[in-house]
């Protein structure tokens, strides 16, 4: 199998395989926050993120969500379909938290009557700015039909995820998704789903996600291990 490095990101390396339509995602032990301003090597993080994301993507595939995930092939690696990533972070918020609370001057933890979908332009140089539908079209990132699909699919995924996490006593506060075009030009879910790109709170309001690292609240891998163990109880 070819192992040529295609791309090195903050949390993952993307490697080529002998099949031009398939890549390997290698999960690193690196933790970052604030667009890479805060950075630390945390042993075991890559294994946990790969386990959690593989588990979630397998369940999403089984539920009929089209994703890039093929299979987990080692503790830190998984096979994915190669996609052309859409340069958008699609964020869904079920509760107020993080940048949303800061932007609108509201306390964290308020349940939103209707989940809110937001777009952020994937551009590190610009610090991934918050943009609206018209900006998305102006930048020729997606058209009206594609924007509608991204929102609808994100809401569908939210219903599945929220139910699964509710089963294990965790609130899905918010999360970030990325999508891409497969070789047929179909939009499918890509990237990962782990505590790196979502907020999870337990019944006491404790953070069970990367906010533990962002805010210096404890050992990240201890929290991720608890999430991983809880996930085993999902039906």
UniProtKB/Swiss-Prot annotation:
GO annotation, biological process: 'de novo' IMP biosynthetic process; cobalamin biosynthetic process
The chemistry this enzyme catalyses reads: 5-amino-1-(5-phospho-D-ribosyl)imidazole-4-carboxylate + L-aspartate + ATP = (2S)-2-[5-amino-1-(5-phospho-beta-D-ribosyl)imidazole-4-carboxamido]succinate + ADP + phosphate + 2 H(+)
Give me the disulphide-bonded residues. none
Q: Which keywords does the record carry?
A: ATP-binding, Ligase, Nucleotide-binding, Purine biosynthesis
Alphabetized InterPro entries for the sequence: SAICAR_synt/ADE2_N (IPR028923), SAICAR_synt_PurC (IPR033934), SAICAR_synth (IPR001636), SAICAR_synthetase (IPR050089), SAICAR_synthetase_CS (IPR018236)
Which pathway does the protein contribute to?
Answer: Purine metabolism; IMP biosynthesis via de novo pathway; 5-amino-1-(5-phospho-D-ribosyl)imidazole-4-carboxamide from 5-amino-1-(5-phospho-D-ribosyl)imidazole-4-carboxylate: step 1/2
Keyword check for Nucleus: no
EC number of the protein: 6.3.2.6
A single Gene Ontology MF term assigned here is: ATP binding
Listed PROSITE patterns: SAICAR_SYNTHETASE_1, SAICAR_SYNTHETASE_2
Concerning its family, UniProt says: Belongs to the SAICAR synthetase family.
Protein name from the UniProt record:
Phosphoribosylaminoimidazole-succinocarboxamide synthase
Q: Which organism is it from?
A: Streptococcus gordonii (strain Challis / ATCC 35105 / BCRC 15272 / CH1 / DL1 / V288)
